[in-house]
Amino acid sequence: MKCTVVALVLLVAVQCLVLGAGPAAAAKARRTRQGDYLNRLRGSPSSRASWESLAAVEEQTTTKAAGRPAPVAAAVEAGRKEADRVEALPGHPRGVDFAQYAGYVTVDAAAGRALFYYLAEAVGGNGDKTKPLLLWLNGGPGCSSLGYGAMEELGPFRVMSDGKTLYSNPYSWNHAANVLFLESPAGVGYSYSNTTADYGRSGDNGTAEDAYQFLDNWLERFPEYKGREFYITGESYAGHYVPQLAHAILRHASPDINLKGIMIGNAVINDWTDSKGMYDFFWTHALISDETADGISKNCNFTAYGAGVASNALCDAASDEVGESLADIDIYNIYAPNCQSEKLVTPPIAPSIDNFDPCTDYYVEAYLNRPDVQKALHANVTRLDHPWSACSDVLTRWVDSAKTVLPIIQELMKNSIRVWVYSGDTDGRVPVTSSRLSVNQLQLPVAAKWRPWFSSTKGAGEVGGYIVQYKGDLSLVTVRGAGHEVPSYQPRRALVLVQNFLAGKALPDCKECEQD
């Protein structure tokens, strides 16, 4: 199989690596991961806007998405909140001291398009009015924020190896905020459309507009969150979703949505720097040979203007060599073990919140396909013709994917929206080198120079990663020892990260360490 990265975004490049994996990798239980889907879905070139032109981005985002009919507004959602209350999830642990809600919000009544959400209110109950509302989005495109975000990363529970029992996550983000997880677009997870043609015309623009419509309708159901400080966070291809939704909020100028900041992790931001940074990471982490790295450097055109250059045989050959070198490791955390079996284990293995189980995807898939779980979540009410899956097999085409979101990030900063870009430093999928190169394209002056931050200040302290702050309220943060899904691998450090992001504070230094 021949794949090249010069004409496609980083996501497509790594899809080539995944599909080109050798027989040894195929014999393992391979996780379907965020970012593996764009090559399969993609049906059109990247959006044409160069990053220097915000006007081009404005033109794209205000154009009707992918020829899809204009959405028809749904009925006002007031009064539905109590019907969405989750009394208890099957297999839940003791001591649940926060409210949960889940259900559907219609975003297009004519198409019958509805998005599924799960809300874990802040610990302590009653949706603590002192804590903000935080929306979490996973990427893909086409991967579930319920399955990944809520059940494997930052949610209040994780699933044990029997696929039936939940255990508590002491570092869940609802210690810091009321956390809303959205499965988007329609066709992902439990979300659906009664117009099946919608599954073939998904894309960046339509996803942002549907997510905005979801928020607008959801706030009618939960009016206590109107005007509450609101933050959007996410990872991977949510590097597109998050700023694009924030941009839609600015354009619609809703008085009910008090957007304060966005935070994106191991995020797809800018095609050519994402791709260059990925191959730089492979070489600097001894994953590919000098010869392969030279072949990539000499024959693959990683520049802002080279991203659309036609494929060439020498670049293809070097890309194939990369795929062979990476076939037997987990590119999403290059130091993590692979899952060796997708079978459930009963009685369950004693879980460890600090040692992420690489087979967790299979436990979550089993749990979310249980009828009693779906009933508790008010999910699958239309009896979908497919099982719940972490990443959608229902979406058939992705019709627009921006080459860059840097101009949108610039626009958000001009509107005093806080922006944090964070990166787990063991991810090879959208690595820290990509994030650094992409942020550097903004050419921002440094406000506070690169330094370590500390996830613990006891004794000699514990370095959680590194941070550099730029003028205009943008911070670039690394998380030490974390892969693509940062809260999965470093949950404590991820909680410190989000707490300080929400507070608008710099991450802790260690000036007081020896006094503790």
Curated annotation (Swiss-Prot):
Q: How is it modified after translation?
A: The linker peptide is endoproteolytically excised during enzyme maturation.
Give me the residues of the propeptide, which is removed upon maturation. Answer: 21-77, 342-352
Segments traversing the membrane? none
Superkingdom to which the source organism belongs: Eukaryota
- The set of disulfide-linked cysteines is 143-391, 300-315, 339-359
An example GO BP is:
proteolysis
Q: Where is the signal peptide?
A: 1-20
Keywords, comma-separated and alphabetical: Carboxypeptidase, Disulfide bond, Glycoprotein, Hydrolase, Protease, Signal, Zymogen
Where do the record's glycosylation annotations fall on this chain?
Answer: 194, 205, 301, 380
Which reaction is recorded as catalysed by this protein?
Preferential release of a C-terminal arginine or lysine residue
User: Which residues does the entry assign to the active site, renumbered to this chain?
Assistant: 236, 427, 484
GO MF = serine-type carboxypeptidase activity
Task: Extract one GO cellular component term from the record.
Answer: vacuole
Q: Per the record's keyword annotation, is Aminoacyl-tRNA synthetase included, yes or no?
A: no
Q: Which SUPFAM superfamilies match?
A: alpha/beta-Hydrolases (SSF53474)
Q: What is its EC number?
A: 3.4.16.6
Report the InterPro entries cross-referenced here: AB_hydrolase_fold (IPR029058), Peptidase_S10 (IPR001563), Ser_caboxypep_his_AS (IPR033124), Ser_caboxypep_ser_AS (IPR018202)
Q: Which Pfam families match?
A: Peptidase_S10
What binding partners and quaternary form does the record give? Carboxypeptidase II is a dimer, where each monomer is composed of two chains linked by a disulfide bond.
Family stated for the protein in its record: Belongs to the peptidase S10 family.
Q: What is this protein called?
A: Serine carboxypeptidase II-3
Which organism is the protein's source?
A: Hordeum vulgare (Barley)
Tell me the organism's taxonomic lineage.
Answer: Eukaryota, Viridiplantae, Streptophyta, Embryophyta, Tracheophyta
The gene for this chain is CXP;2-3
